[in-house]
């Protein structure tokens, strides 16, 4: 996308990043249409699209094309199911505004360590557990998982 924007002499600003994000994610909702729609897949889509989810869904709906009218109708029906699931999961989990309850600063303070890859790995485990629905999106559950993960990595609180 940046190369195209440069060729067209368009600004490489937030609008370019917005277009890039939509292009990167535009096949995700369509993939959900053909598979069983899980809460986890919807949470991840909501998390990655963030506030641009509505625009992404409009783009994806416009992208449903085929010469076979029956196929188009079936895809549109399945797409409507995905949209319902998005609303349901968003209402239940508030994923669009997701913020990991565990911060790198907290991990460094508790375990008296300097910035390193372990911090990112712990945060990633917590984030994935929340997005997969394994733990609720709250501080206590995230903190417990952080401690468990840190212990497995050999970190001890001082």
Summary of predicted features, one role per range:
Residues 3-4, 66-158:
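Charged substrate- and nucleic-acid-binding regions of tRNA-handling and nucleotidyl-transfer enzymes
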Residues 1-74:
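Divalent metal-dependent catalytic cores for phosphoryl transfer on phosphate-bearing substrates
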């Amino acid at each position: 996308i940046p190369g195209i924007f440069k060729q067209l002499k368009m600004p490489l600003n937030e609008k370019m990043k917005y277009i890039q994000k939509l292009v990167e994610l535009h096949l995700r909702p369509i993939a959900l249409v053909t598979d069983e729609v899980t809460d986890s897949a919807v949470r991840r889509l909501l998390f990655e699209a963030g506030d641009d989810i509505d625009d992404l869904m409009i783009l994806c709906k416009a992208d449903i094309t085929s010469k076979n009218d029956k196929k188009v109708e079936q895809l549109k029906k399945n797409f409507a199911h995905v949209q319902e699931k998005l609303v349901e999961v968003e209402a239940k989990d508030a994923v669009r505004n997701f913020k990991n309850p565990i911060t790198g600063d907290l991990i460094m303070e508790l375990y008296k360590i300097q910035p390193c890859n372990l911090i990112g790995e712990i945060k990633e485990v917590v984030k994935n557990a929340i997005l997969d629905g394994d733990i609720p999106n709250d501080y206590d559950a995230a903190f417990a998982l952080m401690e468990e993960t840190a212990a497995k990595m050999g970190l001890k609180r001082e």
